[in-house]
A protein has these predicted regions:
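A short helix-loop-beta-strand connector motif used in the catalytic cores of GNAT acetyltransferases and
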Residues: 46-59
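Conserved GNAT-fold acetyl-CoA-binding loop/helix
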Residues: 25-46
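Generic alpha-helical scaffold signal
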Residues: 10, 35-39, 54, 78
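Acyl-donor (CoA/ACP) binding surface of acyl/acetyltransferases
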Residues: 1-15, 19-24, 59-179
């Protein structure tokens, strides 16, 4: 298994389309987005999965196929902070890919000059909580009823990792900034 992290390419549209359909829980990762075909997947890559000054999204590529995303958004250097996020296709879960990807991108972010990375997950998502904790993100609190999907509201547990926090003892992935 060869895994690299690299910016999304329009060539990843088919993989994104397949991943988006792999598990119903991924619908929350694509709010207000129609991913009904590869053209819509390409539009999503061009827009939401961009790689620029304020947002950096890396495809988690396993053996040449994009199986997930790890990213930073709301990047700002005045306070040296960013918001981290991740998702995996259903068949890529349970093997530590998200944890190692998040750890690798966190190292990249701290090397780039950021100091604090934050993330949040629904409190009913223990797998995402394990990813965050194993990647060195400490729980900081619960934001009550923060998210709404359909008619249901969800609490969000917030985590953060500082550049001064201990580095998790995990093998990293290669982090590329060009496709």
């Amino acid at each position: 298994m060869v895994v690299v992290l690299r910016p999304w390419s329009l060539d990843d549209a088919a993989a994104l389309f397949v991943a988006s359909r792999s598990n119903p829980d991924l619908a929350t990762q694509f709010p207000d987005v129609g991913l009904d075909d590869e053209e819509q997947a390409r539009a999503h890559i061009r827009g939401a999965l961009r790689f620029d000054e304020r947002a950096k999204n890396w495809a988690i590529v396993e053996d040449g196929v994009a199986v997930g995303n790890v990213g930073l958004s709301a990047i700002e250097f005045l306070h040296a902070t960013a918001w981290a996020h991740y998702w995996l296709a259903a068949d890529a879960r349970g093997r530590g890919l998200a944890t190692r990807a998040l750890t690798s991108v966190s190292t990249w972010a701290f090397d780039a000059g950021l100091f604090r990375l934050e993330l949040g997950h629904r409190s009913n998502n223990p797998a995402s909580c394990r990813v965050a904790a194993t990647a060195g993100f400490r729980a900081e609190g619960v934001e009550r009823q923060k998210l709404r999907y359909g008619s249901e509201r969800f609490d969000v547990e917030t985590h953060a990792r500082l550049a001064t926090d201990p580095v998790p003892d995990l093998p990293g992935f290669e982090v590329r900034t060009t496709s």
